[in-house]
A protein has these predicted regions:
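P-loop NTPase switch/coupling surface
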Residues: 1-129
Length: 129
């Protein structure tokens, strides 16, 4: 999975947050370096919440911010946009929009997420566990 862009409207310290990652053919690793409190761990936590929300209705209900995430996975270009629990999911040129229940089945039928996600953090943070 290679994240290309992440936009968050208001999650903890990420307010009007918009980051574009450089992407290279064949994938690459990204390292986040910055001052304490800059939002590195918060961004990772937010990405994990987005990904886990499609496996857990309880996590989805906790997401009270709008977001957009563009990424490549398994030779597919994916864009997920959520605002007020209304979704628009685009996979290449195919899209689905609507409620959580509707888009969740679409996502599961298209295998849009990796089976395992690894986040490494060198400080103390109980939220990423």
């Amino acid at each position: 999975m290679q994240i290309k862009r992440l936009q968050i409207d208001d999650y903890l310290c990420l307010v009007d947050f918009d980051i574009v990652f450089d992407t290279v053919s064949g994938g690459s690793s990204t390292i986040l370096i910055g001052e304490n409190g800059a939002g590195k761990s918060t961004m990772i936590e937010c990405i994990l919440n987005i990904l886990m929300s499609f496996d857990s209705p309880a996590i989805e209900k906790q997401i009270d911010y709008s977001y957009s995430m563009e990424y490549n996975y398994a030779q597919k270009a994916v864009c997920i946009v959520q605002s007020n629990h209304n979704y628009r999911i685009t996979v290449d040129d195919v899209f689905c929009e609507g409620s959580y229940k509707r888009v969740r089945s679409f996502i599961q039928s298209h295998s849009l997420f990796p089976q395992r996600i690894i986040a490494f953090y060198s400080g103390v943070n109980n939220k990423l566990l």
